[in-house]
């Protein structure tokens, strides 16, 4: 197959592994920077151009689109979909999962277990928002954050109110969420490919930190997940409409809960922790499913 990877940095571990794994399996693989792509939006012959050449005749496209370029990156991916190129994850599914509020509402609608979460606008409702999640300690998440950035632990009522006031003063939206103290700063990343959990790892926050993200110094190790957790991860990815997803779970006193569904999960932590060839598994999915024009909107809302 002829595969295109949309990535701003070909030296990143995940991008390198996807190139290596594809070529090892006999595929032609090319990496292009989505921000250098530009489009001819035509009803008769839609095109994508890159540094003066036309990009065409690809069997599949693998989006590795960072959160900061979601708008433009998904526009480029959508243009490939219009041209009939099979996307590993569809543009609409990526946009859906990147919106923390929208994705939380959709997961809740389908009965997926979540930490108690509130969202509001008026300063008059701040105290009620805090009380609805059980009071401090509590987590406040910026809707635009990624890799643990914009996620703050408020340990007291005064800290919670001050943080909420500060975020409102900056005119940014946020979620207030219960803090799962019994998790001890750990969560579980389930890597879903084609409605199967193909690998899972435990991420443990470094001492003095409650965020377990690998980018923030968290340590990865192998973990055995339960059948219920496996089913929950697959369902969460399906609700988002994602073929490939990193579903983050946290174990609470009242069962496992979904923290987030990531549409562009990194490969380094989970491949090194588990020893599994996740990049190869992604290509196995593409080999089975990538067909010209086989683009359809998955998920709802």
Curated annotation (Swiss-Prot):
SUPFAM superfamilies recorded: Glutathione synthetase ATP-binding domain-like (SSF56059)
One of the GO biological process terms: SOS response
Q: Where is the ATP-grasp domain?
A: 104-287
What's in the keyword line of the UniProt record?
ATP-binding, Ligase, Magnesium, Manganese, Metal-binding, Nucleotide-binding, Protein biosynthesis
User: Would the keyword DNA damage be found if you checked this record's keyword annotation?
Assistant: no
GO CC entries = cytoplasm
Tell me the residue numbers annotated for binding Mg(2+) 2: 260, 262
Q: Which residues bind Mn(2+) 1?
A: 248, 260
Q: What are the binding positions for Mn(2+) 2 in this chain?
A: 260, 262
Q: Where does ATP bind?
A: 141, 178-179, 187, 211-213
Q: Which Pfam families match?
A: RimK (PF08443), Rimk_N (PF18030)
EC numbers, comma separated = 6.3.2.-
Cofactor descriptive note:
Binds 2 magnesium or manganese ions per subunit.
Q: Which domain of life is it from?
A: Bacteria
Q: Which cofactor does it need?
A: Mg(2+); Mn(2+)
The enzyme's main class, written as a single word, is ligase
Q: Which PANTHER family match?
A: RIBOSOMAL PROTEIN BS6--L-GLUTAMATE LIGASE (PTHR21621:SF7), RIBOSOMAL PROTEIN S6 MODIFICATION PROTEIN (PTHR21621)
This one is known as Probable alpha-L-glutamate ligase
- Report the source organism: Alkalilimnicola ehrlichii (strain ATCC BAA-1101 / DSM 17681 / MLHE-1)
């Amino acid at each position: 197959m002829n595969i295109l990877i949309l990535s701003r940095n070909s030296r990143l571990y995940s991008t390198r592994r996807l190139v290596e794994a594809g070529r090892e399996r006999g595929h032609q693989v090319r990496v292009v920077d989505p921000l250098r792509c530009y489009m001819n939006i035509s009803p008769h012959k839609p095109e994508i151009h890159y540094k003066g050449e036309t990009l065409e005749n690809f069997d599949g496209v693998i989006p590795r689109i960072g959160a900061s370029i979601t708008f433009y990156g998904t526009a480029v991916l959508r243009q490939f979909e219009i041209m009939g190129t099979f996307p590993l994850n569809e543009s609409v599914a990526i946009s859906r999962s990147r919106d923390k509020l929208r994705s939380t509402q959709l997961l809740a609608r389908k009965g997926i277990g979540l930490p108690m979460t509130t969202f509001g606008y008026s300063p008059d409702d701040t105290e009620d928002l805090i009380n609805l999640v059980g009071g401090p300690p509590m987590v406040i998440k910026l809707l635009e954050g990624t890799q643990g950035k914009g996620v703050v632990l408020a340990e007291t009522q005064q800290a919670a109110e001050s943080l909420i006031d500060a975020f409102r003063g900056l005119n940014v939206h946020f979620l207030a969420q219960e803090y799962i103290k019994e998790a001890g700063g750990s969560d579980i990343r389930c890597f879903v490919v084609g409605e199967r959990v193909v690998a899972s790892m435990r991420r443990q926050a470094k001492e003095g930190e409650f965020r377990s993200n690998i980018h923030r110094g968290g340590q990865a190790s192998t973990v055995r997940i339960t059948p219920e957790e496996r089913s929950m991860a697959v369902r969460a990815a399906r609700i988002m409409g994602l073929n490939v997803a990193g579903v983050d779970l946290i174990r609470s006193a009242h069962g496992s809960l979904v923290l987030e569904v990531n549409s562009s999960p990194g490969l380094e932590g989970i491949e090194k922790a588990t020893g599994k060839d996740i990049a190869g598994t992604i290509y196995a999915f593409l080999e089975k499913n990538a067909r010209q024009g086989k683009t359809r909107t998955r998920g709802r809302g």
